[in-house]
């Protein structure tokens, strides 16, 4: 009998020893898919966050860049990944534009939304020698001159910064198509065009122009935020500059494939919240002019719905909406 009892006890102990680690989550590395190239804005935010995230989780967090198709390749990879909690993604505003533009049948509705990690605001930046000293002067000129007289850039046609520019004009009761949009491969080439006089303004983020602003080669006339930016305290908001409400920012968000286990999701969400609040993560982002953000449960879902609707309205005004 004693042998049987000891054997049973050993069996039970063995079961607990096996079942404990098998149910621990996470127990292996986690990957975050970034739809944009290494060294870009989204990549920088995610790598900064990932360093804190792996400290909180106790397992490695690997950042994987899946580029191509204007972000479609990477966003699709996130959507189609196994929903086991070990593959997450970094979504950007473009996924809220694809379906309206008709470029891909994917949207934020296809993802489990955790939270935004950070934002960088759009702005209106001109060359240092531009005749426009204020946004009010620039808007008045766009209003009074023929369509195409003034131009902007910052991304491709229908991209995030194009939406920022179109929304600004619509808020000022100006046909968004009056402003000529010059496609570019990003902020750097667009800012070169601004400084050379090739285009009137840059409606991407002043964060992308930070070194040029500090060198006095460009000026930011306004930021597209509800309140002034800590990074650019001298730049008025659109409301302050022209008396109209318009805000727009690029955001970088933590997401997962649909269908992730609720318990695993909660573990990841709580760890991610702690990671984003870590002093070294906050300071590293702020040093780059990036504003850290963390959404309460459900808050990002509401934001995403509002963002998608607002962007669709602007794209319709620009004559770019296909759906």
Cite the ranges covered by each PLM segment:
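Short, flexible turn/loop "capping" segments at secondary-structure junctions
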Residues: 25-27, 115-119, 245-249
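An extracytoplasmic/periplasmic, membrane-proximal ligand-sensing/linker region
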Residues: 27-29, 262-323
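Hinge/capping helix and adjacent helix->loop/strand transition within the periplasmic-binding protein
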Residues: 77-86, 99-189, 238, 251-284
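C-terminal lobe and pocket-closing loops
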Residues: 208-277, 306-309
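Positively charged n-region of N-terminal signal peptides that target proteins for export
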Residues: 1-5
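A ligand-binding cleft/hinge motif common to bilobed small-molecule-binding domains
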Residues: 93-103, 166-173, 196, 200-234, ...
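N-terminal (or domain-start) structured segment
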Residues: 23-110, 174-201, 292-295, 317-323
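Bacterial N-terminal signal peptides
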Residues: 6-19
